[in-house]
């Protein structure tokens, strides 16, 4: 939610509407969505390379450490999926278009604000590590945040202008004036965070002591994410809205000023609403009244009692209960163990695929992971008999169809995607948790087209990323080259390196090698950020990989977790993976890079051996050979298997002279064809 222009209006009148706070020794309810966006966009993180998740995790950790140092107890509340009415769909589509334009700008060296794909998952992982209390609401969180803050008599931290409308007992602290990086002390002992708190009383006093109860009507007349009626322009054009005394600053907010001054003349919302309707054609009045009243309800207390979740672990949401969803699904959603992507697919049979900083001239990067989503949709098909009566009643029966809002060029379109019909024991969502670990793991790996034996030498924490990488390599849409795969696998070594460095039992020599390699990775990452131009094709390839990982994680969560969830904060760093690509293309070899740390070298070999059997043969050819090989294949028109066999015979020990990659052992390429045919 959010009221257009209101936040900048109140900030223009900061001295009148805000009071200074020294925040300490209190609970605080935090709008999680607003916080992770704010931290992502205000921390000098590079947004071009698909996410420096390690750096973002560090920022999130420092933020909460500042709160802890001031004895501030945070409770983070995250938005869930869209509600059953889907009333924000138009707004969401508009935002999706805006994100595409910003992603395009970033991709060609311009500016823009686009969250990396896995930022929400990283944020939740950091909350869990720090033991910060959090909940994921079933749908939009604003009302639940307001209700909880009033129950606990504590402030709200957000950047959403709707919190200027809610009647909050202890007030609303905007994130942009919450100076957590500039912690101060009282008498040299008690830490506090300087902040500003919005005063609703001062705001209403400024407008002739207007009744607070009029503000929800102001919000819907002004236009928020839920209401944007063209007919309201009729009212605004006919009503002579008094601007009052306006400064040069106030002219850009003439609609806000006019509405507030006009509304301040009425005693209550009923009187004001009747006067609004007078300006509209009689035939429209009843419908408009119903819509406005319904939208004003969005600013009332919520029925959800989040304090029960934080104190007892019970989350009761009437809207969710009315849908008859399985209990385990509701619990997993509240705990953030299932993504809002799942609830959108479940409730609306519609998902929105977020754009990344990718090549806009190519098909969107999420195309590659569509088969994984089709399995997810198949698992959600028979979730509840109530869903067909609610979300799907206006459409002709399409029992296997889901819709996806996706990027096409620099716009969006809605595509109809068929779900995969699964075996009977997989198609009952309520009983999915009863399936054995073996069955759930089998479904996950069959979807990813990976043999379980391939993953046996892989550390538990990397099994899912490696399985996803095998899936990614098998798809023809992926134009990955050897250096892309190598860079990705090298980046996966960061977590194990940190573990070696922090392990007290390791010998000094091992620790030194790990420290040196980690320092080299940090140097590469820093060098990449200095301004090298983004390689769009490389960016697109890694966007495809991230999409596969995201959907692989969502399927893994839904099954639930037959493989451990990877630590995203140490798994992928966009700046590092792009920098390693450049180095491997220029001169460095993997062998020379890893020579300083034998443990990392051994792990890399395990990862490489697992993935190489799923890679197309041409990925291992020296530069210049791949294209000629393709031409030769066309000319000879031989079968795929014969070509693979012949390639293997000729490329068992290629030495890639240009890049000094050393010997690339590819004697097991035949396994690729076997692994693609999972039973």
From Swiss-Prot:
Domain of life assignment: Eukaryota
Annotated segments matching region Interaction with SHLD2: 351-400
Enzyme Commission code: 3.1.-.-
InterPro entries reported for this sequence: Asteroid, PIN-like_dom_sf, XPG_DNA_repair_N
GO annotation terms (biological process): double-strand break repair via homologous recombination; double-strand break repair via nonhomologous end joining
GO molecular function (one): single-stranded DNA endodeoxyribonuclease activity
One of the Pfam families matching this protein, by short name: XPG_N
Ranges for region Disordered: 625-645
Entry keywords, A to Z: Hydrolase
This protein's record includes keyword Hydrolase: yes
Keyword Hydrolase: yes
Compositional bias segments (type: Basic residues): 626-635
Subunit structure as annotated in this protein's UniProt entry: Interacts with SHLD1, SHLD2, SHLD3, RIF1 and MAD2L2/REV7.
Family as reported in the entry's similarity comment: Belongs to the asteroid family.
Protein's name in the database: Single-strand DNA endonuclease ASTE1
């Amino acid at each position: 939610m959010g009221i257009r222009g209101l936040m900048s209006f109140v900030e223009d009148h900061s001295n009148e509407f805000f009071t200074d706070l020294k925040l300490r020794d209190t609970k605080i309810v935090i709008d999680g969505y607003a916080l992770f966006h704010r931290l992502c966009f205000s921390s000098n993180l590079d947004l071009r390379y698909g996410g420096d998740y390690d750096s973002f995790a560090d920022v999130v950790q420092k933020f909460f450490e500042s709160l802890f140092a001031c004895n501030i107890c945070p409770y983070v509340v995250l938005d869930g999926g869209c509600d059953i009415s889907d009333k924000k769909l138009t707004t969401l589509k508009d935002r999706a278009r805006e994100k595409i334009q910003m992603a395009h700008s970033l991709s060609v060296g311009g500016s823009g604000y686009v969250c990396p794909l896995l930022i929400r998952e990283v944020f939740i992982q950091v909350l869990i590590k720090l033991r910060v209390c959090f909940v994921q609401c079933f749908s939009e969180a604003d009302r639940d945040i307001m209700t909880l803050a009033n129950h606990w008599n504590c402030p709200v931290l957000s950047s959403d202008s709707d919190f200027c409308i809610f009647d909050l007992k202890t007030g609303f602290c905007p994130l942009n004036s919450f100076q957590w990086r500039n912690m101060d002390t009282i008498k040299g002992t008690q830490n506090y965070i300087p902040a500003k708190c919005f005063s609703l009383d001062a705001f209403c006093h400024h407008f002739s002591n207007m009744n607070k109860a009029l503000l929800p009507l102001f919000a819907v007349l002004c236009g928020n994410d839920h209401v944007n009626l063209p007919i309201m322009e009729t009212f605004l054009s006919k009503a002579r809205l008094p601007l009052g005394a306006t400064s040069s600053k106030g002219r850009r907010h003439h609609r806000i000023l006019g509405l507030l001054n006009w509304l301040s003349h009425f005693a209550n919302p009923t009187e004001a609403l009747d006067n609004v309707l007078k300006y509209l054609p009689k035939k429209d009045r009843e419908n408009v009244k119903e819509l406005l009243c319904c939208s004003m309800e969005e600013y009332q207390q919520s029925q959800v009692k989040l304090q029960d979740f934080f104190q007892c672990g019970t989350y009761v949401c009437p809207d969710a209960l009315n849908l008859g969803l399985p209990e385990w699904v509701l619990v997993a959603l509240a705990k953030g163990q299932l993504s809002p992507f799942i609830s959108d697919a479940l409730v609306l049979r519609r998902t929105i695929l977020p754009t990344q900083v990718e090549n806009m001239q190519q098909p969107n990067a999420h195309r590659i992971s569509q088969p994984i989503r089709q399995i997810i949709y198949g698992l959600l098909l028979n979730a509840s008999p109530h869903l067909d009566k609610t979300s799907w009643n206006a459409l002709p029966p399409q029992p296997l169809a889901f819709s996806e809002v996706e990027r096409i060029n620099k716009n969006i379109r809605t595509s109809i995607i068929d779900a995969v019909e699964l075996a009977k024991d997989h198609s009952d969502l309520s009983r999915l948790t009863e399936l054995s670990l073996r069955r759930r793991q089998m479904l996950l790996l069959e979807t990813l087209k990976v043999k379980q034996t391939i993953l046996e030498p892989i550390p538990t924490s990397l099994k899912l990323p490696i399985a996803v990488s095998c899936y990614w390599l098998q798809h023809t849409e992926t134009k990955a080259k050897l250096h892309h795969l190598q860079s990705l696998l090298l980046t996966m070594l960061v977590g194990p390196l940190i573990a070696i460095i922090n392990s007290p039992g390791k010998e000094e020599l091992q620790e030194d090698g790990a420290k040196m390699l980690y320092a080299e990775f940090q140097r590469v990452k820093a060098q990449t950020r200095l301004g090298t131009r983004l390689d769009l094709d490389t960016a697109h390839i890694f966007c495809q990989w991230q999409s596969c990982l995201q959907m692989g994680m969502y399927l893994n969560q839904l099954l639930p977790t037959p493989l451990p969830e990877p630590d995203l904060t140490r798994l992928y760093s966009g700046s590092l993976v792009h920098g390693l690509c450049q180095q491997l293309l220029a001169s460095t070899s993997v062998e020379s890079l890893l020579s300083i740390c034998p443990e990392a070298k051994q792990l890399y070999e395990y990862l490489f051996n697992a993935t190489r059997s799923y890679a197309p043969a041409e990925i291992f050819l020296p530069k210049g050979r791949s294209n000629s090989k393709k031409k030769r294949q066309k000319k000879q028109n031989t079968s795929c298997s014969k070509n693979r066999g012949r390639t293997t015979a000729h490329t068992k020990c290629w030495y890639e002279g240009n890049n000094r990659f050393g010997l690339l052992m590819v004697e097991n390429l035949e396994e690729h064809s076997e692994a693609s045919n999972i039973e």
